[in-house]
Design a protein with these regions (language model features):
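Hydrophobic alpha-helical core bundles mediating ligand binding, dimerization, or RNAP-core interactions
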Residues: 21, 28, 40, 69-73, ...
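Short, flexible active-site loop motifs that bind/organize anionic cofactors or intermediates
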Residues: 23-26, 55, 80, 130
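Short, low-complexity N-terminal intrinsically disordered segments enriched in polar/charged residues
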Residues: 1-39, 142-143
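A beta-strand edge to alpha-helix "cap/lid" segment located at domain peripheries
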Residues: 2-13, 74-143
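Hydrophobic pocket/interface hotspot
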Residues: 21-24, 35-37, 44, 65, ...
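A solvent-exposed, acidic/Ser-Thr-rich amphipathic alpha-helical stretch
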Residues: 41-89
Length: 143
């Protein structure tokens, strides 16, 4: 079962939105930021819903999300194609999706990264429109 429906009875919009969410996290995990840019709605927002860590707060639009937020983290701190976002649970209802995931990877300094996440997404026009990210911010503050 996915999203409260047996898969064979999942409405087409929910199947499509599940595919969009899975493609988004696969592309993010691969570090393919230019491809990721195309999966984001032009008016996308990405909210880091924690306090007290670098990067917390809202990011608006593709440029800020990719160039000012994701690129410095992924290319500055981690080895290529890290960290991976591994979906553990995905629930889709209409244009909304909830994801429980693990972030696994390796920093350039050789240290391992292993964090837990919850993401809440809204899809609009077959693109990621709004994303809210929750994580273990205490873990991040100790790195």
């Amino acid at each position: 079962m996915r999203g409260g429906h047996k898969e064979e009875f999942m409405p087409d919009v929910e199947k499509r939105n599940e595919e969009i969410v899975r493609a988004f996290f696969e592309t993010l995990s691969a570090g393919e930021l230019e491809k990721l840019r195309l999966l984001l709605h032009e008016d996308a927002t990405w909210g880091i819903m924690v306090t007290g860590i670098q990067g917390a707060g809202d990011k608006h639009g593709r440029k800020e999300i990719i160039d000012d937020f994701l690129k410095p983290i992924r290319e500055g701190l981690f080895i290529p194609a890290n960290p991976k976002v591994v979906i553990q649970h995905l629930v889709v209802q209409g244009q909304y999706a909830a994801v429980e995931a693990k972030g696994l990877g390796k920093f350039k300094n050789g240290k391992d990264y292993n964090n837990r996440y919850a993401f809440f997404l809204e899809i609009k026009d077959d693109k990621i429109f709004h994303l809210r990210e929750y994580m273990d911010s205490y873990y991040v503050s100790t790195l």
